Amino acid sequence: MLRRVVLSRLYARLGGPAVSAGRGGRRGVASSVPPSGSTSPRALNIFDRELKRKQKNWAARQPEPMKFDYLKEEIGSRIADRVYDIARDFPLALDIGCGRGYIAQHLNKETVGKIFQTDIAEHALKNSIETDIPTVNILADEEFLPFPENTFDLVVSSLSLHWVNDLPRALEQIHYVLKPDGVFVGAMFGGDTLYELRCSLQLAETEREGGFSPHISPFTAVNDLGHLLGRAGFNTLTVDTDEIQVNYPGMFELMEDLKGMGESNCSWNRKALLHRDTMLAAAAVYREMYSNEDGSIPATYQIYHMIGWKYHDSQARPAERGSATVSFGDLARLNDTMSQGKK
């Protein structure tokens, strides 16, 4: 199911209310587990993970990082809503790629007893939002989780997995650390994210420079995501799509916000710089092709939401093929008989 939400990024409101959180559960300090910049041998090395760590650290060190948290807080709240929908308690939870703790701030200690938060950016962990849930922050890579098998009742992840080089391995790691009958609830950017910006940059660069380079990072297709979750061992899968449209004053304000979110491109094949006239042309193309009636420009963020369970004997299972005792033909005849009886 596709839902679209439209938000407005109004720069007059940059100094909005700061996020507050209780201090009932004092968080632990970051552990000595270092983030890994390497990838597994089978992975394509698409992203510069060290650059992504620097980008996220830079964003977390800004004087008011909450100015750029609007999208991540929105998705964090939606993941928390899905956790509450499960209607059970989770004594031990894990947030992978937590950033400043965008999911935990929307959870409560009645539902989650204790949470471990991991990220590759140490400054994001140091500046994470405090909640009343006992919290331990650990510096760790999404592809190399430092936890034993069958540890967590719940694993969550919000807008982080689209930057890993080996998504299959990351999902396998999540499945590995979950307890039997544990659940993974996550969200990541989808393939149509920022299509307006991608198209505008490509058209302008082709016109001005005779070709174009990728300036928007590649994203996973929704059909592939369900397959990868199943291959990692998850069952009872749910994958759905949201679109969030945010309106900005212009293209340069959009790019400034992406930098403030720590979401700038970190692909190895990225072009370091674009010429000034190419950027101005891209901004003009963006406004010409996509602008709203009020002069603002929209940016679309496609979100893939996913839920997957680790197998347990208590879970419902599909019946074996050929075990049915009633055919569809029998049901059709029964329906006809009941219809005639009503007449």
From Swiss-Prot:
Top-rank taxon: Eukaryota
Q: Which GO terms describe its molecular function?
A: monooxygenase activity; S-adenosylmethionine-dependent methyltransferase activity
| Record GO cellular component, one term | mitochondrion
Q: What SUPFAM superfamilies would the database entry show? A: S-adenosyl-L-methionine-dependent methyltransferases
Question: Can you say what this protein is called?
Answer: Arginine-hydroxylase NDUFAF5, mitochondrial
Q: What Pfam families does the record point to? A: Methyltransf_11 (PF08241)
Q: Which organism is it from?
A: Rattus norvegicus
Q: Where is this region: Disordered?
A: 18-40
The family classification in the record reads: Belongs to the methyltransferase superfamily.
- Does the keyword field hold DNA damage? no
Where in or outside the cell it occurs: the entry states: Mitochondrion inner membrane
The free-text function statement in the UniProt record for this protein reads: Arginine hydroxylase that mediates hydroxylation of 'Arg-111' of NDUFS7 and is involved in the assembly of mitochondrial NADH:ubiquinone oxidoreductase complex (complex I, MT-ND1) at early stages. May also have methyltransferase activity.
Picking any one GO biological process from the record gives: mitochondrial respiratory chain complex I assembly
For this UniProt record, the keywords arranged alphabetically read as follows:
Membrane, Methyltransferase, Mitochondrion, Mitochondrion inner membrane, Oxidoreductase, Transferase, Transit peptide
